[in-house]
Amino acid sequence: MIYEICTLTDPGLTRDNNEDAIAVDTLTGLCILADGMGGYNAGEVASGMAAAFIKSEMACWLAQTGVNSSAKEVRRALEICVENANHSIFTAANSNPQYRGMGTTLVMGVFQGNRVTLGHIGDSRCYRMRGDTLVQLTKDHSLLQEQLDAGLISVEDAKTSLNRNLVTRALGVEEIVMVEVNEYRVEVGDRYLLCSDGLTDMVADEDITATMLGAGLLEDKAARLVQQANDHGGRDNISVVLALAKEGVVKRGVLSRMLGK
């Protein structure tokens, strides 16, 4: 299995800066998306730190272990990298008054062979398109999701709820954070979408489905998704990562050959 990956981020129509951050390492199948929060550009700092830090640590580990790593090993490495990133952001936030309280959501995927390991914190999401069916693989860590789970609000009312952007878990806000990790089997033709809530707050699932099913390259689909969010108001930064699973064999990199992997 090989993966084609593309990314796109846009500030939207109402924000002066972009507090979303994306980091991808195509050689190891690592995709990271973070949506920062905090005043005075602190959200931009938090998301940028998360994306850069996790990419640096996780991509290095993946390059060394390669396809020989088990799902359990990938899960543990992901958890450690996120723990380290959380500590780094939390320390920075408490060392600089300008950054106090900053944090970020996180959704990341490690695409290896016929499996993907997903990690997420907050309300940035991962969807899978298999055939003509779109499935949300991650569950938001948010007050609204808790209300939905408890039956306190209907799905229809949730679309206009004032609690829709209140996350219950974020990277860098507290000294310890728990990343939710899940593994899924990948099939040839699967398409994966990692996105910030700037997309999902503006674009309905049925419209995302239509775009994912439409003709064109991944880059075309990413551009259409961002345009749809802006057409519906673009009230937040919009970021997407698209990954397409294709039949093929990954060529070993230089480091893997040196390590005899």
Language-model regions, residue ranges each:
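PP2C/PPM-type serine/threonine phosphatase catalytic domain
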Residues: 1-261
